[in-house]
Swiss-Prot record:
The gene is CPS2. GO terms for molecular function: copal-8-ol diphosphate synthase activity; hydro-lyase activity; magnesium ion binding; terpene synthase activity. The keyword Magnesium applies. This is Copal-8-ol diphosphate hydratase, chloroplastic. It is an enzyme of class 4 (lyase). Residues 1-24 form a transit peptide. It comes from Nicotiana tabacum (Common tobacco).
Length: 802
């Protein structure tokens, strides 16, 4: 099947309509199509994350967003069948993760498919060592690759996705190669026929999908073809526009700049005219002998100069490409994008060791001043690779500065390369994501966030999401999600659910001088593993939800005004953040702690509860034995103590059984400290956050001793977390929006990000820091989304398989 690129634009919210409900799918689409991208509570323009937004999309019909009421009842009917399926999933997942690990460990210089365009240019090089007049190509394997890889319609290029720029450029250069070496004329003639029949399609080709430098290199090849008397309609009207574009682009390229400063023009030297000063240009070679890792540009340079370094590079490329040619090396971009895809698909936790090696490689070639390019040791950098490196390195604990982004600031705008005219949605999307991993005082990231937010909003508003660097399944959907749920409010399992539907797998394709594929980044193995893992985790979550409901009934929490909906939300927030099957204990500890806290605060807030009553409960809690009934009745105080004690005892026993660590005393101290705050009517709501974190970390075995509580970094984390969550809780409960207080939350979040991800000499386990951040994100998320959207996410994350 061949995919034709057209101007039709997919509706960017299609991934929201998959929910099964009484509302028909078509009705759901019609409903969503009324509304553009929106934030439910806050607009994220600039540094003010909390500007109020007028909603134009409220709905009274919760069913199409996800009616969670149907999930509030227990259902054990499929437990046995689900267990067998779960075993099968685990076995399959093991095989897929091993396959992915092999891919990551064997990435080396980055895998790309062989490119007809570069292969043909390398095949142009004559073997000057031949005696006599019988000239032959220096790289006969490249010529043979061209002969062996013509498509059935007579063209060369990407087979599945039909892009007219790609097909015409590849076909023309291969026709020239066959003509130059006077071989396989029937294939050449078939290629010429394809060009004649399809040249007019340039009139309707999407400019956004024009291959890089097409307006430079295509006219050059036409001139070369004309010199070889290849029968092509050189006076076709559509070619006049291409030549005009070439002249415009050449006027924007100062010749002196080309010869003195490394620029992206080095990538397309074969498209320039003959008045080049090679003595000066050779000084701009990369250490590997290439001109910006382009075999075509380097082949052209070699034919003009006979430079030995150019030849060495080309020989290496052909050897690495099994007789053809491709851009080489591509080691940095493949590593970064593979990590990014696996993270967003929600399966990165399987590959922690592999990620460490991949990022060590990237960091080895990180240039603090200039940033990086697709391949190592480049003398040119771009914003896309640079911002992706900053974000991923920073999130994994590497000490990197964002100052290199100043190279891509042009006035009040940001560009991918110096001198770029038109911005790209995907590059600004990646820069926007990078800008949110912001430390206090980093002005360049603040400016990048402001610019990219507005840029991406305009892309969606004007249906201008076609990208000049990649053809992907759902770029509008990716942008919509990033704007709708900024990083602070994006829960891992929610993001994974969306991205599994947005990721095109092996169907996604990249745009350079021609179309190309990066199997290390885009493949169906990643997608298959992500879907399998998602359903595997979800099955565990549904089982735990049954446990939560039974526990809820047994403990009689409804006496304290706690609803099953609150129970479901509590479990969802935990499961959407700590989702791994193996982390059931931490997940349940999180969810149950919220319910226990709610029970105690509800009891304390009762008008009949006095300071004396609070103190009595605290004193009873300090006693090791269970409370006794008074006059044979189980009072509320007794029920509170019983539920609390049983929860802590069970958690302690499970942790000891699984990890061999006795956390009972530490748990007792943590909850006792919180009860003291509650007794004194202090702001225990803030302290509740730190209690959640301590309980989760203790259950995970991350806190081995109490001394860490007095560590300065831990105290800073704890205080800042309590402060931020207190403000977010106030926003959620009191519907406070706007004002300086809200700006301060943004500043506090930046400080928290630095404490969690900054490369400090802290004694605190990174898992402990990550728990702080995960809990804070759930508070941010809860303040950020509407009840309808949360219902929808609950349905998608916990109950609907992918």
């Amino acid at each position: 099947m061949q995919v034709i690129i057209t101007s039709s634009h997919r509706f960017f919210c299609h991934h929201l309509h998959q929910l099964k409900s009484p509302t028909s799918l078509s009705a759901q689409k019609a409903e969503f199509k009324k509304h553009g991208p929106r934030n439910w509570l806050f607009q994220t323009e600039g540094s003010l994350l909390y500007k109020p937004v007028r909603l134009n999309c409220a709905t009274s019909d919760a069913s199409y967003l996800g009616n969670v009421n149907e999930y509030l009842e227990s259902d054990h009917s499929k437990n046995s069948e689900e267990k067998d399926i779960q075993v099968s999933r685990t076995i399959q997942m093991k095989g897929l993760t091993e396959e992915i690990k092999h891919m990551l460990n064997s990435m080396e210089d980055g895998r790309l498919n062989v490119l007809a365009y570069d292969t043909a240019w390398v095949s142009f090089i004559p073997n000057t060592t031949n005696n006599g007049n019988d000239q032959r190509p220096m790289f006969p394997s490249c010529l043979q690759w061209i002969i062996d890889n013509q498509l059935s319609d007579g063209s060369w290029g990407e087979e599945i996705v039909f892009c007219i720029y790609d097909r015409l450029l590849n076909t023309l250069v291969c026709v020239i190669a066959l003509t130059l070496w006077n071989t396989c004329l029937h294939k050449r003639n078939k290629g010429v026929m394809f060009i004649k029949e399809n040249l007019s399609k340039l009139e309707t080709g999407e400019v956004e999908n024009m291959t890089s430098g097409f307006e430079l290199v295509f006219p050059t090849l036409l001139e070369k073809a004309q010199q070889l008397d290849i029968d092509i309609p050189y006076d076709a009207p559509v070619l006049k526009d291409i030549y005009a574009r070439r002249e415009v682009k050449l006027t924007r390229i100062p010749k002196d700049v080309i010869h003195t400063i490394p620029t992206t023009v080095l990538f397309s030297l074969e498209g320039l005219r003959d008045d080049l000063d090679w003595q000066r240009l050779l000084k701009l070679q990369m250490p590997d002998g290439s001109f910006l890792i382009s075999p075509a540009s380097t082949a052209f340079a070699f034919m003009e100069t006979n430079d030995e370094k150019c030849l060495a590079y080309l020989q290496n490329v052909v050897e690495k490409s099994n007789g053809g040619a491709r851009q080489y090396p591509f080691d940095l971009v493949t590593r970064l994008w593979a990590i990014d895809r696996l993270q967003r698909l929600g399966i990165s936790y399987y590959f922690a060791e592999e990620f460490k090696e991949l990022l060590n490689h990237v960091f080895r070639y990180w240039d603090e001043e200039n940033g990086i390019f697709s391949g190592r040791n480049s003398n040119v950098s771009d914003v896309d690779d640079t911002c992706m490196a900053i974000r991923l390195l920073r999130l994994h604990g590497y000490d990197v500065s964002p100052d290199a982004l100043n190279n891509f600031k042009d006035g009040d705008q940001f560009v991918c390369f110096r001198g770029e005219v038109d911005g790209s949605p995907t590059h600004m999307f990646n820069l926007y994501r990078c800008s949110q991993v912001l430390f206090p005082g980093e002005k360049i990231l603040e400016e990048a966030k402001n610019f990219t937010y507005n840029f991406l909003q305009q892309c969606l508003a004007n249906n201008r999401c076609l990208d000049k660097w990649v053809i992907a399944k759902d770029i509008p959907g990716e942008i919509w999600y990033a704007l709708e749920f900024p990083w602070y409010a994006s829960l891992p399992r929610v993001e994974a659910r969306y991205y599994i539907e947005q990721y095109g797998g092996a169907d996604d394709i990249w745009i350079g001088k021609t179309l190309y594929r990066m199997p290390d980044v885009n493949n169906n193995v990643y997608l298959q593993a992500a879907k399998l893992d998602y359903n595997r985790c979800q099955s565990q979550h549904r089982f735990e939800w049954l446990i939560m409901q039974e526990w809820f009934e047994k403990c009689n929490f409804q006496q304290f005004g706690i609803s099953k909906k609150y129970l479901l939300v509590s479990y969802f927030l935990a499961a959407a953040s700590i989702f791994e099957v193996e982390k059931s204990r931490e997940r349940l500890a999180w969810a149950k702690s919220r319910i226990i806290c709610k029970m105690i605060t509800s009891y304390y807030n009762d008008e009949a509860t006095t300071w004396t009553t609070r103190n009595s409960l605290l004193m009873e809690f300090k006693v090791s034995h269970d409370p006794t009934r008074k006059n044979g009745n189980e009072t509320k105080e007794i029920l509170v103590l019983k539920n609390l004690r049983q929860f802590l005892r069970q958690l302690s026993e499970e942790t000891f059984e699984d990890l061999g660590k006795d956390i009972h005393h530490q748990l007792q101290n943590a909850w006792e400290t919180w009860l003291v705050f509650l007794r004194e009517e202090k702001n225990a709501c803030q302290e509740e956050t730190e209690l959640l974190v301590r309980t989760i970390n203790l259950s995970g075995g991350y806190m081995t001793h109490d001394e860490i509580l007095f560590d300065a970094d831990y105290e800073n984390l704890s205080n800042l977390t309590n402060k931020v969550c207190g403000k977010l809780n106030e926003l959620q409960n009191d519907k406070v929006t706007g004002g300086s207080k809200n700006t301060n939350i943004e500043l506090d979040m930046q400080a928290l990000v630095k404490l969690v991800f900054g490369n400090t000499s802290s004694n605190i386990n990174q898992d402990i820091k990550q728990t702080f951040f995960a809990v804070v994100k759930t508070f941010y998320y809860s303040a950020h989304v509407s009840e309808e959207i949360m219902n929808f996410h609950i349905s998608k994350v916990l109950f609907q398989q992918v």
